[in-house]
Curated annotation (Swiss-Prot):
The keyword Metal-binding does not apply. Gene3D superfamilies: Spore Coat Polysaccharide Biosynthesis Protein SpsA, Chain A. Transmembrane segments: none annotated. Keywords: Magnesium, Nucleotidyltransferase, Transferase. This is UTP--glucose-1-phosphate uridylyltransferase. It comes from the Bacteria. Its EC number is 2.7.7.9. Belongs to the UDPGP type 2 family. May play a role in stationary phase survival. NCBIfam families: galU, PRK13389.1. Its cofactor is Mg(2+). Pfam families: NTP_transferase. One of its GO terms (biological process) is galactose catabolic process via UDP-galactose, Leloir pathway. The gene is galU.
Amino acid sequence: MAAINTKVKKAVIPVAGLGTRMLPATKAIPKEMLPLVDKPLIQYVVNECIAAGITEIVLVTHSSKNSIENHFDTSFELEAMLEKRVKRQLLDEVQSICPPHVTIMQVRQGLAKGLGHAVLCAHPVVGDEPVAVILPDVILDEYESDLSQDNLAEMIRRFDETGHSQIMVEPVADVTAYGVVDCKGVELAPGESVPMVGVVEKPKADVAPSNLAIVGRYVLSADIWPLLAKTPPGAGDEIQLTDAIDMLIEKETVEAYHMKGKSHDCGNKLGYMQAFVEYGIRHNTLGTEFKAWLEEEMGIKK
């Protein structure tokens, strides 16, 4: 049984995927490094972790993802140039990419054997501790919720208080494309957690246990590690994280947490384009001008 007083301070972000849904843009650039206005996608996910109180982040990478590692490393030459040219605001932005109190590490996933395997690759670094798992394709809209209080931050608080693993969910129209949780029909409001009894991967609409799909945020007790280690290959001959979660549900209480606000699936072209527009019109310096241009292009009268 998970130790209730163990705090979640470590997160695993799997970034080894090849991003085939975003080709040809991702042929030479990791999908996680595609920009969302003026920051790469991975930066938003890391910022979310930091806002939630995470201090150690493990990126599970691939040999083609060196630019992600470089992004979070110190660039002495760039910083010296910005200092020399008195570009103080840009220098501050570059230096804030990875705050001093946060450690970002990398481990390699040598073979593409599924999400469960990717998380397991981080076990030697995380150790036998509870962990947050964050899928970088999904961006939680920072304009629709408070990253320091809601969603991942709230899931971590809930785990720290109860010892119950947390799986983030949100209602979807098409359940056949997602992992769907079974909460025995209990109604769930945004910000609430209730015990779940199982996960069904991509169910048929007429037999789906709910319309609550997993969003891509998990806070898991340390008991997940031995279960992942013994999880056999499942769909696609890959080690599935949901299979290990099903075993965890048999062992202890696992709760579904209803996301606050909205999410953006930036792992597909339409979702990425929608996120870019929404973040563009809300940007603190470019938003007003961009929105005016967009309205003019669309023929929208003020």
